[in-house]
């Protein structure tokens, strides 16, 4: 029986991104944002294909999510505006200029977010690693979260499929981090709370490192710079990928879990499928 030793650090990184348990971009370089927004500077993305971030000086950052299920369309757009008097003025100015015919849902998020409800375990782990665990006020699917501090401290908001709306309201969160699905038809009662819904569609990226790069967006929500953390993960991942190529193939891997009467498995071109391929499994 062969023993396989896994680098603890990359395993931990893969876990919190949802990789192991687990836009089509608008334009590049100088970018003209849509819907009457100012032109700004695009933040370079090395791997992510469904995420575009445009920096507009110190006033605000525009984040655009491509719809991974319908090519050429947008899933959501976020305007991240710092809190404070100047931020208030920016919000007012942008609201007056925003076109009524926006191509996708647009939410303004005041940063840093200090209270949130997180619907997935991997994103809880990421926030923990980024040093913003105190911004987690509530979670869904608490049984799948293995961080002692979070399990002890935060409010259980029920199942991610049937969240406890009253508990969420009582927490007065500034943002909800949810995992979107194709043809979901919206978020029901959550849509009526008028709380920004952060659609964490990173799992639909075209590569594991593309998925990991979304931490740059999540970090901005909480005023945390994720560049250094991402660089370490990238280096570790590529190093282990090189090592894995030299190992004999044939390792069997059991993925996901049973949901109802169905046991879903990742497709070969999904982030999990590519991860397993890179691990030579």
Predicted regions and their residues:
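Bacterial Sec-dependent N-terminal signal peptides
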Residues: 1-33
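Hydrophobic/aromatic ligand-binding patch that stacks against planar heteroaromatic rings
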Residues: 5, 126, 167, 189, ...
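Bacterial Sec-exported substrate-binding components of ABC uptake systems
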Residues: 26-121, 225-254
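A short, structured surface patch at a secondary-structure boundary
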Residues: 69-170, 174-180
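Short, solvent-exposed loop/turn and secondary-structure capping segments
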Residues: 127-131, 187-190, 266-268
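Short, structured coil segments at secondary-structure junctions
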Residues: 132, 153, 193-194, 279
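Alpha-helical, coiled-coil/dimerization segments enriched in small aliphatic residues
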Residues: 142-145, 204, 265-281
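Extracytoplasmic substrate-binding proteins
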Residues: 164-167, 174-177, 183-264
């Amino acid at each position: 029986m062969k023993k396989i030793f896994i680098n603890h650090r990359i395993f931990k990184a893969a876990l919190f991104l949802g990789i192991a348990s687990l836009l089509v971009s608008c334009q590049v370089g100088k970018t003209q944002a849509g819907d009457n927004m100012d032109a700004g500077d695009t933040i370079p993305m090395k791997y992510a294909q469904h995420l575009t971030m445009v920096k507009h000086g110190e006033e605000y950052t525009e984040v655009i999510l491509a719809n991974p299920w319908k090519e050429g369309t947008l899933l959501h757009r976020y305007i991240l505006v710092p809190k404070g008097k100047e931020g208030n003025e920016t919000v007012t100015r942008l609201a007056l200029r925003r076109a009524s015919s926006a191509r996708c849902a647009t939410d303004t998020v005041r940063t840093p977010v200090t209270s949130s409800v997180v619907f997935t375990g991997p994103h809880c782990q990421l926030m923990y690693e980024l040093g913003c665990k105190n911004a987690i006020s509530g979670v869904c699917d608490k049984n799948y979260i293995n961080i002692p501090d979070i399990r002890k401290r935060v409010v259980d908001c029920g199942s991610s499929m049937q969240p406890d709306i009253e508990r969420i309201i009582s927490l007065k969160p500034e943002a909800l981090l949810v995992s979107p699905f194709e043809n979901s038809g919206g978020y029901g009662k959550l849509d009526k709370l008028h709380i920004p819904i952060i659609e964490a569609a990173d799992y639909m990226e075209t590569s594991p490192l593309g998925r990991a790069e979304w931490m740059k967006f999540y970090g901005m929500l909480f005023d945390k710079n994720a560049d250094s953390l991402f660089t370490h993960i990238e280096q570790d991942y590529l190093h282990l990928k090189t090592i894995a190529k030299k190992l004999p193939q044939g390792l069997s891997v059991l993925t996901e879990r049973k949901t109802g009467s169905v046991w879903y498995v990742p497709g070969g071109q999904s982030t999990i499928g590519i991860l397993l391929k890179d691990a030579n499994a």
